Amino acid sequence: MKELEYPFDNGFIMKKKRSLKRQLLGDGAVRLKKRVAVLGGSTTDDIVSVLELFLLDMGFECEFYRSEYGQFWQDAVFSNEELDRFKPDIVYIHTSLRNLSFSPTPRSGEEEIEQGLNAELDRLSQAWDLSLIH
């Protein structure tokens, strides 16, 4: 679909996402079905709706699981019956700066920053590794 080719107009895509989806679903293409879990640290509705368009255009028809707002960590690390039943083929962890536990200050020393960064990477790696188990 031309509208989804680079360089694309993200404002147009957001405005016309429903009609673009109808066009893609109505084109008669055979698509591979996949289940995608989107574990979000922030609102993921727009991410999912746009991701769905690009995946449809690339030949994938996806069913999506969305974590509750800010629950990416809990869904990834702890057992979640709904997510377990969903059995995702793909897990996408959508986080932002707000989801970081460590926040250095201008007075933070190099060692403190290094330790904080390593702890943050360990935490995110744990979420990623455990999300793959579900």
Residue ranges: model-predicted function:
Residues G40, R66, H94-T95:
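Glycine-rich, histidine-containing beta strand-loop boundary motifs that form or position
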Residues I133-H134:
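Conserved small/polar residues in nucleotide/adenosyl-binding loops
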Residues M58-W73:
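A short beta-strand-loop structural module common to alpha/beta enzyme folds
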Residues A76-L124:
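Oxyanion-hole/transition-state-stabilizing segment in secreted/luminal serine hydrolases
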Residues T43-D45, G70-Q71, S96-L100:
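Short, solvent-exposed loop/turn segments at secondary-structure junctions
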